[in-house]
Amino acid sequence: DVVQLIRGPNGSFVRLQIQPGNAPPGTQEHVLTLPRTKITLEAQAAKKEILKVKRGDKELKVGVITVPSFYQDYNARAAGDDEFRSTTRDVRKLLDEIKAEGGVDGLVLDLRENGGGHLSEAIGLVNLFVPKGPVVQLRETGGRVEVLESEDKAAAYSGPLTILVDRFSASASEIFAAAMQDYGRGLVIGQQTYGKGSVQNLYPLDRYALGQDPGYGQLTVTIGMYYRVTGDSTQNRGVQPDISLPSAISVEDVGESSRDSSLPWNRIRTSTFKPEGSLAPMLAELQRDHDVRVAGDADFRYTQAEIGAFESMRSEKSVSLNLEQRKADRERRTQQQLA
């Protein structure tokens, strides 16, 4: 219903009355006016940025590629366009540009808020960093297991790799992050991912109707489960990061495990695969370095304090009916945020 209210003619405007989720009672709402326009593939496409990071007396170049979704221009591909856009093609192009610009000392793939998309693109993206090998296992409801593999191609990038994830990284994002983790190819940083390990298919109901145009819609049916090459499912548990970052998003409130009808986690046999390496020996040192950096970073401390204040406010089970008391509480929280 909300989506239908937001949608409208191209060029028109929609006004949204917004109150932040962590705002105390009585906070004034903000009105946000947005122009309606057609969402293009370009707006959702992968993008790159080169950051210069100081490390001691050295200046390192770090490439950051943001991947909002696992997309593919199906219409262009169906029309025979050899230059159709896709996540894998666009990221490879960005990697080629980075190489042409002198390369980088490390690469970050940002999959935060990436809710997934085409499975084939997740497999293709893995292939840019890992040569041929199994990427994900698919078990159907009847028990048959299919191992989906990447092609026999040389990796487009073989340097240090980090994958950023959050609680909204789901489905294809989890498949990619899990493969990078299992192959020891990249360090996963962020929050526990969404935990969507089930496979759905759409069945149009009109095919069973007798009328000309009944408009019965379609039915979404779960037909299987995804599993990592290790045999573990991503269902409910998602992908656990190697290094955790603070987040105000509650795992209990957001994610597949928060749903009443969520399927349980399970595992199957491990697929045969050869890890690219192992990050385990350096994880303890990385965690120590991370803890030291967080302790000395004012922005991190502020973020953690805000999260603590938000958790405290969310745990409150009652609100004062006295207006002056509510105003005083709001002012106190505001001062805490500014401190």
Report the location of each language-model feature.
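Generic structural hydrophobic/aromatic packing signal, biased to beta-strands
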Residues: 34, 62-65, 91, 135, ...
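Cleft-lining beta-strand/loop regions that shape enzyme active-site pockets
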Residues: 1-210, 225
